[in-house]
């Protein structure tokens, strides 16, 4: 089974695809979608096109998205909600459903502490998947963590 984990962001959208087979996890690919255009409509289209490419190329079975973190800037939260809505619609069209996890759930699943720092989550991602190189930016390790969290909640196959 292939799981796509997504960490939506207003400038970078982290993604990771992991394989979950026989209770073993392995990383297939991970990266981020850089949102560089200035017009919101173009940003949404770029994001959706990139998601389409990932779904086509890697034959994803399940998708997990991290819930929006409510920061102090309402404008950023609204923009992020628009991105997340567009992602959700595309995933529903292509896959049929998706799962959502709060940052607290993801941190707790990987570190045992719902208030863990992003660096602690990145450390556990590397440890669980036997990754020796640095994972930068942290949007990528967050996306991997979302995928791992989802894999942990699935029934063994």
UniProtKB/Swiss-Prot annotation:
It comes from the Bacteria. Mg(2+) 1 binds at residues 7, 139. Pfam families: RuvC (PF02075). Gene3D superfamilies: Ribonuclease H-like superfamily/Ribonuclease H (3.30.420.10). Its EC number is 3.1.21.10. GO terms for molecular function: crossover junction DNA endonuclease activity; DNA binding; magnesium ion binding. CDD domains: RuvC. GO terms for cellular component: cytoplasm; Holliday junction resolvase complex. PANTHER family: CROSSOVER JUNCTION ENDODEOXYRIBONUCLEASE RUVC. Homodimer which binds Holliday junction (HJ) DNA. The HJ becomes 2-fold symmetrical on binding to RuvC with unstacked arms; it has a different conformation from HJ DNA in complex with RuvA. In the full resolvosome a probable DNA-RuvA(4)-RuvB(12)-RuvC(2) complex forms which resolves the HJ. Belongs to the RuvC family. This is Crossover junction endodeoxyribonuclease RuvC. It comes from Helicobacter pylori (strain J99 / ATCC 700824).
């Amino acid at each position: 089974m292939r799981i796509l984990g997504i960490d939506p962001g207003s400038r970078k959208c982290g993604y990771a695809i992991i394989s979950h087979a026989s209770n073993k996890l392995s990383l297939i690919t991970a990266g981020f979608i850089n949102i560089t255009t200035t017009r919101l409509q173009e940003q949404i289209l770029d994001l959706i096109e990139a998601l389409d490419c990932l779904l086509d190329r890697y034959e994803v079975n399940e998708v997990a998205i991290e819930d929006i973190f409510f920061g102090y800037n309402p404008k950023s939260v609204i923009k992020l909600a628009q991105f997340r809505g567009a992602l959700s619609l595309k995933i529903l069209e292509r896959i049929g459903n998706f799962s959502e996890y709060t940052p607290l759930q993801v941190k707790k699943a990987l570190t045992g502490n719902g208030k863990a720092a992003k660096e602690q989550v990145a450390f556990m991602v590397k440890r669980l998947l036997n990754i020796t190189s640095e994972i930068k930016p942290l949007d990528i390790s967050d996306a991997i963590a979302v995928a791992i969290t989802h894999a942990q909640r699935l029934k063994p196959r």
